[in-house]
UniProtKB/Swiss-Prot annotation:
PANTHER family: LIGHT-INDEPENDENT PROTOCHLOROPHYLLIDE REDUCTASE SUBUNIT N. [4Fe-4S] cluster binds at C29, C54, C115. Pathway: Porphyrin-containing compound metabolism; bacteriochlorophyll biosynthesis (light-independent). SUPFAM superfamilies: Helical backbone' metal receptor. This is Light-independent protochlorophyllide reductase subunit N. Component of the dark-operative protochlorophyllide reductase (DPOR) that uses Mg-ATP and reduced ferredoxin to reduce ring D of protochlorophyllide (Pchlide) to form chlorophyllide a (Chlide). This reaction is light-independent. The NB-protein (BchN-BchB) is the catalytic component of the complex. It comes from Cereibacter sphaeroides (strain ATCC 17023 / DSM 158 / JCM 6121 / CCUG 31486 / LMG 2827 / NBRC 12203 / NCIMB 8253 / ATH 2.4.1.).
């Protein structure tokens, strides 16, 4: 059966030499992952062991007031903690005791490291083991780092899920595991498509509740829905699970190839695949064509932010008619992103890490039609006449699978359209 997709390029970018940069970075820390994880995991609580700056970041980013009792909070390290004048472990134990007494619905507690806790070498791994022994089995305590010293933006989710994997129950069952946090409506769409293909049981990590945690074993196969889950990928592989490599489900082509890789793994017939995917594929294609009209023939430059960049570059170049000048990403995991890189025609610079001043020099030299970058860089670039897209929106907006393909294209076309309108108004 032909999938009716454009042929792959003669030479992709998988073997392209990567420009590795290790300079000043302009990116959020891994604590920001808590913003979407606390909404997804409904019996979990994320306790950041950090400073008031950490608390302000989370409260501002989440858009909630602390008296609304969200499923996250900050155990603030005071000056006496930082100076070693107080027993930080004893203070932490007291805070956890108070929290669990006040919130008996908590079944998973994550101690999240920050820059201050890293600086004073507070051993949160040992603290998690101690608190799990004290409060278990009703509450399991995990730890991971969201420190800006160690992590960037989406790595917080990766560290969180990787901390869960060793505790998942063992199973010999043949199961498909979808790995990565998605909005509920998008996750439901994915599971529905897979169920219609006759694939199951389908389990998800992270689960909504601790009691729904999936098992993992040698008969588990897993598909990533987010490209930034390198540590989680490694943890699952060590448990015996096998990764189904595929482009990520952004746009019509990415979603089709992602589903096809899973369908082939489970022996789904070509006729069944066509019957299930034909209608949503047609809707996605139509939506992308309409939303990307203003993008065709234009160039895009990705500054590193979320690790979604290679997959999105594939979407823009293959489905929206753009050309990529540079695809920058905080970390490039070829084992995970290889199928996407195969579909990006040779030509753009691939860069890993960041030296922000040098990258900005390359942006100014290339003069791309659209620059995808972090919040802190967007306004200065706009002031210089560049058209920018906030990279953070691509993480917080539902953009996966067929029904969101048009919305994804629209996120890129809106700033281009806005710039064109402003130019017309200025000319008048």
């Amino acid at each position: 059966m032909s999938l009716d997709l454009p042929p792959p390029p003669a030479r992709g970018c998988r073997s392209t030499e990567v420009l590795k940069e290790r300079g000043q970075r302009e990116v959020f820390c891994g604590l920001t992952g808590i913003i979407w994880l606390h909404r997804k995991m409904q019996d979990a609580f994320f306790l950041v062991v950090g400073s008031r700056t950490c608390a302000h970041l989370l409260q501002s980013a989440a858009g909630v007031m602390i008296f609304a009792e969200p499923r996250f909070g900050t155990a603030v390290l005071e000056e006496k903690d930082l100076a070693g004048l107080a027993d930080a472990n004893a203070e932490l134990d007291r805070e956890v005791d108070r929290l669990l007494a006040r919130r008996p619905d908590i079944r998973q507690l994550f101690l999240v490291g920050s820059c201050p806790s890293e600086v004073i070498k507070l051993d949160l791994h040992r603290a998690a083991e101690r608190l799990s022994a004290h409060h278990g089995p009703a509450v399991r305590v995990y730890n991971f780092s969201g420190s800006g010293i160690e992590t960037t933006f989406t790595q917080g989710e990766d560290a969180c899920l990787a901390s869960i994997v060793p505790t998942l129950p063992a199973t010999e069952a043949r199961e498909l595991l979808l790995v990565g946090a998605l909005p509920d409506v998008v996750e439901d769409q994915a599971v529905s498509l897979l169920t219609q293909l006759g694939i199951g049981p389908v389990r998800c990590l992270p689960a909504h509740h601790a009691a729904e945690a999936p098992g993992v074993g040698p008969n588990t196969v897993f598909a990533l829905v987010q490209p930034f889950l390198g540590d989680t990928h490694g943890a699952l592989t060590r448990r015996g699970a096998r990764h189904i490599a595929a482009p990520f489900p952004f746009g019509e082509e990415g979603t089709t190839l992602w589903l096809k890789a899973i369908a082939d793994e489970f022996g789904v017939s070509a006729d069944t695949f066509e019957a299930v995917t034909a209608a949503p594929r047609a809707r996605a294609r139509k939506a992308v064509a309409a939303a990307s009209e203003g993008l065709r023939g234009k160039s895009v430059f990705f500054l590193p932010d979320s690790q979604l960049e290679p997959s999105l570059a594939r979407f823009l170049t293959r489905e929206c008619g753009m050309s990529a000048v540079e695809v920058g990403t905080p970390f490039l995991h070829r084992g995970i992103l290889g199928p996407d890189l195969d579909l990006i025609a040779e030509g753009p610079v691939l860069s890993e890490g960041q030296d922000v001043e040098r990258q900005l020099d390359r942006v100014r030299a290339a003069r791309p039609d659209l620059t995808v970058c972090g919040l802190g860089l967007a306004n200065p670039l706009e002031a210089e006449g560049f058209t920018t897209k906030w990279a953070i929106e691509l993480v917080f907006t539902p953009v996966h699978f067929y029904e969101q393909a048009g919305d994804l294209a629209g996120l890129f076309s809106r700033p281009v359209r806005r710039r064109a309108i402003l130019r017309r108004e200025a000319a008048e």
